[in-house]
């Protein structure tokens, strides 16, 4: 069953008012075959180094969404075609990147949903720097591990708990 972000907002106005349901800023471009996806969040806080992205995506996704706070950097890509395929293979439903992706043609055939600020041809560094499973500041909303993420063509929602259809 698909969750529609507009319907979720309309049905949960008290949660929007008290901040237990948040809307990310409308700054993301869509990549990947899945235009709508939902699941609990796993989080990363990194900057121009995607080592932890690979490490996370090598683990079983179990229907989760990987939320990557890349600091909004537009100087390199944090996710590319190989990582998109890895995410699909390991059961992740989506990736949201506060940063860039590359290999967009490859990403667009991956059977997951991806949101990112832009595309950039340069790869990131590989130093192993960053934090995993921490609260991250995404554009317009804080995301904590285990928050529920709902994504479709109208936007990205962050909920403190799983919402009904």
UniProtKB/Swiss-Prot annotation:
This is Putative 4-hydroxy-4-methyl-2-oxoglutarate aldolase. Substrate binds at residues 80-83, 102. A divalent metal cation binds at residue 103. It comes from Cupriavidus pinatubonensis (strain JMP 134 / LMG 1197) (Cupriavidus necator (strain JMP 134)). One of its GO terms (biological process) is regulation of RNA metabolic process. Keywords: Lyase, Metal-binding. It comes from the Bacteria. It holds the Pfam family RraA-like. Catalyzes the aldol cleavage of 4-hydroxy-4-methyl-2-oxoglutarate (HMG) into 2 molecules of pyruvate. Also contains a secondary oxaloacetate (OAA) decarboxylase activity due to the common pyruvate enolate transition state formed following C-C bond cleavage in the retro-aldol and decarboxylation reactions. InterPro entries: RraA, RraA/RraA-like, RraA/RraA-like_sf. The keyword Metal-binding applies.
